[in-house]
Swiss-Prot record:
Attaches a formyl group to the free amino group of methionyl-tRNA(fMet). The formyl group appears to play a dual role in the initiator identity of N-formylmethionyl-tRNA by promoting its recognition by IF2 and preventing the misappropriation of this tRNA by the elongation apparatus. The keyword Protein biosynthesis applies. This is Methionyl-tRNA formyltransferase. SUPFAM superfamilies: FMT C-terminal domain-like (SSF50486), Formyltransferase (SSF53328). (6S)-5,6,7,8-tetrahydrofolate binds at S113, I114, L115, P116. CDD domains: FMT_core_Met-tRNA-FMT_N (cd08646), Met_tRNA_FMT_C (cd08704). It is an enzyme of class 2 (transferase). Keywords: Protein biosynthesis, Transferase. GO terms for molecular function: methionyl-tRNA formyltransferase activity. Its EC number is 2.1.2.9. Pfam families: Formyl_trans_C, Formyl_trans_N.
Amino acid sequence: MSKPLRIVFAGTPDFAAQHLAALLSSEHEVIAVYTQPDRPAGRGKKLTASPVKTIALEHNIPVYQPENFKSDEAKQALADLNADIMVVVAYGLLLPQAVLDTPKLGCINVHGSILPRWRGAAPIQRSIWAGDAETGVTIMQMDIGLDTGDMLKIATLPIDASDTSATMYDKLAKLGPVVLVECLADIAAGTAIAIKQDDERANYAKKLSKEEARINWQDDAEHIERCVRAFNPWPMSHFEVAENSIKVWQSRVEASSHDAPAGTILKADKSGIYVATGHGCLVLEQIQIPGKKAMPVQDVLNARAAWFEVGSVLS
């Protein structure tokens, strides 16, 4: 049996917390946790600890929350921990080379896609947005680049036709910890194999924006439907009708032909709101009007039928 690793864990959101929990149940020793400083949250804007900090405190693990690693004090504090390795999962801070070089075995990162396909901040969303058949988790040895380090372990998952970013996030949050613990076992045993990324196959998964999530009805129906799933739970695909912003939670593609201008409502009944697009027809199945929760289209039509009259054009 390999000697347990002394691990410093760096992460912030719930996705990271699930990986920390797996490490705490493994043979390895988590000697310290780094996480983002407490941030105001909720209506009262009360300073709130990250999910990672909450778990660390429950297990009496020392917590460090530097704003950055620019100071000599911050770098020295990490060095004093004498860690074998740092595990980084959705930490939210860029790590300078001096930090990457501090642990004996360097730093590894859990990335929510199959590298090098999607590097950057929004790989889960972009994989759905692009119509990829699968995604997964990559464990990589970190270098100074953006998700450019050598790959140590990859596990894949199919993207189902009904998957949203929310459902894929949950699936990867379950897969990632398993792959991480397996990878650490390889590292501890000295059997991990590092594979260089093919930079020519890399794409940048840029952050999502509310502007991008506004539906362009000139696009083809299949692309819009993928956007609806990719932008759920944020920033949510939306359109305007009667000067109201409507969020789309669920839709489907109808393979019917039409000659109506893009954005025109072709039909509206309990089966959905049928909207002409640049190619094909998009059927809205679940939407959210201002001040209400997401509802089946039938319920919305009972209250707001005038907004969705056949022949009217959505913007």
